[in-house]
């Protein structure tokens, strides 16, 4: 995709709760000029119905071609977004989904690549860091053109939680969650700030917040998905808008800094050969470069521990015969 191309085409693979919410976000925000929705054959009519339903909103937003797509429609797409996979159930961790979703991911990526697709993959299916890695392996694409949603939603939750605690606009809070999109993620407290003022200094000047309150706040962010899943069965609105934001950055060649699942080549000491959440510059050609925030010793240890856990899952998954050949690529 070139920065000057005017007609932007997105193919969505997976029309479940996350996928359909993402499609709705694209329509609402006027992102892309063409949206194709791919579903498995037995759910093809769901994609047809959603495309028709979404098209009825176009008179209120902006022109867009929306349709139920097939894999051959990926050939000239700028972006393929993968949300398809088994959903996380109450009591399950995201990493519990590996066995179910790796085979699904392989079949999807194989079909997309077979179409002649030359664009960018954006992965949101869980466990997103593992499935972003598998998308890279199965596709043979350059690492810059395979991106995961990573900790984009976690960071948004973190900013919102801090904003509520401090009674300020979340857009004025700048803070990141890094590591796995899951239980081993961590807050980068050392670089959190409000309007450029270091969070620690801001808290001293503005209000007295105990450390225990901040620990509880982070735990609420980390466990937010479990809380929502127990209440309503799934999370989809937040991640849908996060995906729309990433999509906009790619299609508009923004060179925006967003927390994404990014390939690691030693940016953080011993963290290599995996995808994991960190800030990165993203534009029309995918990841321009990672933004390597200097971590303190405690944060560095958490980053390495998170990567170690992901690597163990990846190594175990790709030791199986049906996936082992991808690791030789």
Curated annotation (Swiss-Prot):
Homotetramer. One of its GO terms (molecular function) is L-lactate dehydrogenase activity. HAMAP family: Lactate_dehydrog. The active site is at 181 (proton acceptor). GO terms for biological process: glycolytic process; lactate metabolic process. Gene3D superfamilies: Lactate dehydrogenase/glycoside hydrolase, family 4, C-terminal, NAD(P)-binding Rossmann-like Domain. Pfam families: Ldh_1_C, Ldh_1_N. GO terms for cellular component: cytoplasm. It catalyses: (S)-lactate + NAD(+) = pyruvate + NADH + H(+). Substrate binds at residues 88, 94, 126-129, 154-157, 235. Its main location: cytoplasm. Catalyzes the conversion of lactate to pyruvate. The modification Phosphotyrosine is found at residue 226. NAD(+) binds at residues 18, 39, 46, 71, 85-86, 107, 124-126, 149. Beta-D-fructose 1,6-bisphosphate binds at residues 159, 174. Allosterically activated by fructose 1,6-bisphosphate (FBP). This is L-lactate dehydrogenase. Keywords: Allosteric enzyme, Cytoplasm, NAD, Oxidoreductase, Phosphoprotein. Its EC number is 1.1.1.27. It comes from Streptococcus equinus. It is an enzyme of class 1 (oxidoreductase).
């Amino acid at each position: 995709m070139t920065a000057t191309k005017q007609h932007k085409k997105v193919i969505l693979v997976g029309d479940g709760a996350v996928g359909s919410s993402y499609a709705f976000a694209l329509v609402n925000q006027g992102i892309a000029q063409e949206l194709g929705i791919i579903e498995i054959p037995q759910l093809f009519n769901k994609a047809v119905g959603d495309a028709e339903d979404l098209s009825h909103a176009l008179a209120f937003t902006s022109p867009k071609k929306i349709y139920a797509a097939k894999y051959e429609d990926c050939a000239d797409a700028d972006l393929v977004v993968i949300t398809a996979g088994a959903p996380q159930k109450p009591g399950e961790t995201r990493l519990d989904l590996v066995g179910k979703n790796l085979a699904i991911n392989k079949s999807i990526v194989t079909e997309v690549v077979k179409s002649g697709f030359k664009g960018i993959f954006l992965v949101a299916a869980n466990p997103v860091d593992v499935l972003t890695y598998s998308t890279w392996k199965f596709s043979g694409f350059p690492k810059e053109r395979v991106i995961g949603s990573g900790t984009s939603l976690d960071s948004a939750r973190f900013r919102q939680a801090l904003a509520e605690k401090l009674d300020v606009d979340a857009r004025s809070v700048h803070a990141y969650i890094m590591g796995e999109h899951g239980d081993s993620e961590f807050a980068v407290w050392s670089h959190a700030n409000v309007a450029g003022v270091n969070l620690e200094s801001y808290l001293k000047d503005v209000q007295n917040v105990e450390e225990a309150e901040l620990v509880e706040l982070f735990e609420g962010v980390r466990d937010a998905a479990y809380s929502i899943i127990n209440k309503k069965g799934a999370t989809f609105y937040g991640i849908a808008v996060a995906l729309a934001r990433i999509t906009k950055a790619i299609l508009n060649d923004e060179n925006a800094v967003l927390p994404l699942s990014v390939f690691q080549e030693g940016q953080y000491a011993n963290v290599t050969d995996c995808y994991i959440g960190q800030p990165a510059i993203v534009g029309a050609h995918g990841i321009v470069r990672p933004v390597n925030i200097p971590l303190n010793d405690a944060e560095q240890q958490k980053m390495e521990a998170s990567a170690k856990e992901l690597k163990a899952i990846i190594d175990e998954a790709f030791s199986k015969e049906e996936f082992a050949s991808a690791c030789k690529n």
